[in-house]
A protein has these predicted regions:
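N-terminal Rossmann-like dinucleotide-binding module
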Residues: 1-56
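Beta-loop-alpha module in the N-terminal Rossmann-like domain of NAD(P)-dependent dehydrogenases
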Residues: 47, 56-103
Length: 104
């Protein structure tokens, strides 16, 4: 059975849209890669966040990134927020034992 990688994405603006499309395409381009589960998308505005969740195919949404990072069912945290927030989120995710992808 193929391994599953459960992804959380923090941020859903322009780069969040781009990364969402990339996550959906990974297994198409790399069929031998682990299965990608787009588990949770996180942002501040509940309404816009729910729209992004439905539009891009994420299973769940959450407004508190700290809750997302604390979850046991997340393997990768994809940080797509504004640049001045990257450090705090990325370091917290690494300390929680997550793999981190951080948009520059």
């Amino acid at each position: 059975m193929a391994q599953n990688l459960r992804v959380a994405m923090i941020g859903y603006g322009f780069m969040g849209k781009v990364h969402s499309h990339a996550w959906r395409s990974v297994n198409h381009f790399f069929p031998d890669a682990p299965n990608i589960e787009m588990t949770v998308i996180c942002g501040r505005s509940k309404e816009a966040l729910e729209n992004a969740r439905m539009t891009f195919g994420w299973k769940e949404s959450e407004t508190d990134w700290k809750k997302v990072i604390a979850r046991d069912d997340i393997d990768i945290v994809d940080v797509c927020t504004a640049g001045d927030t990257h450090e705090e989120i990325a370091i917290a995710a690494l300390k929680a034992g997550k793999h981190v992808i951080c948009e520059k």
